[in-house]
Amino acid sequence: MQIVILKDSASVAEYGANIFIKQLQKKADSVLGLATGSTPLSLYQGLIAANKDKQISFKAVTTFNLDEYLGLEGTHPQSYRYFMNEQLFDHIDIDKSKTFVPPGDAENPIAACQGYEDKIKSAGGIDIQLLGIGRNGHIGFNEPSSGLMSRTRVKTLTKATIDDNARFFKEGEYQPHLSITMGIGTILDAKKVVLLATGENKAEAILATVEGALTAACPASALQLHQDAVLVIDEAAASKLTDRDFYKHIEVENQKLMARLGL
């Protein structure tokens, strides 16, 4: 697991965006795993700018989002399909028929979950998966106690996640308590995983992810098993790591090696 500790959220977004830009420059028909929430927004702005500047193109790209609220149509302002259109897809040269979000309005959610897995497989698997992390260590909507080898499925949201997301819904508006989410096993199948985290409120979750035990109590700890997982975090999110100075030293040496190898 590569730990990159940067000074602030803007630096985190820029570093994360550059990972995706390099991926698209290397492989124009990349399959990207995408995430929603506040953390990726600045990263998406970086990708939009790079697309407008002709540094990258999304014309051959396929995308799969991590999750979606069950019970919301894609036109609902709080659906993740709506979010992705508003924050990224409407601003880049992507073929929307190749952008996939779990169907929150599926008549048969169980069948839809298997169908989502099949689509990922048919696309050749995910080249690079973007993640955020919840205060309780959830990734996607894989809440604590989720199986570490789980696949795309229907999940019940915890009260903590419901409370965290309540700010996005108007008072009295229906807020779903169920979701469709890629499983932890699905996420681990990605060739590369990039997790972004900023703010002191994520410090406990980052501590558990990096220095804690591999456990279903912290779903993100499963990234310890991945051969190419990169955690890009700011100083606040890293504040409880006991070995953060060592992680910074490792990254400096890693960058020297990459420069020497021309990578």
From Swiss-Prot:
Its EC number is 3.5.99.6. GO terms for cellular component: cytoplasm. It comes from the Bacteria. It holds the Pfam family Glucosamine_iso. It comes from Shewanella halifaxensis (strain HAW-EB4). This is Glucosamine-6-phosphate deaminase. The active site is at 67 (proton acceptor), 136 (for ring-opening step), 138 (proton acceptor), 143 (for ring-opening step). Belongs to the glucosamine/galactosamine-6-phosphate isomerase family. NagB subfamily. Homohexamer. GO terms for molecular function: glucosamine-6-phosphate deaminase activity; identical protein binding. Pathway: Amino-sugar metabolism; N-acetylneuraminate degradation; D-fructose 6-phosphate from N-acetylneuraminate: step 5/5. Keywords: Carbohydrate metabolism, Hydrolase. It catalyses: alpha-D-glucosamine 6-phosphate + H2O = beta-D-fructose 6-phosphate + NH4(+).
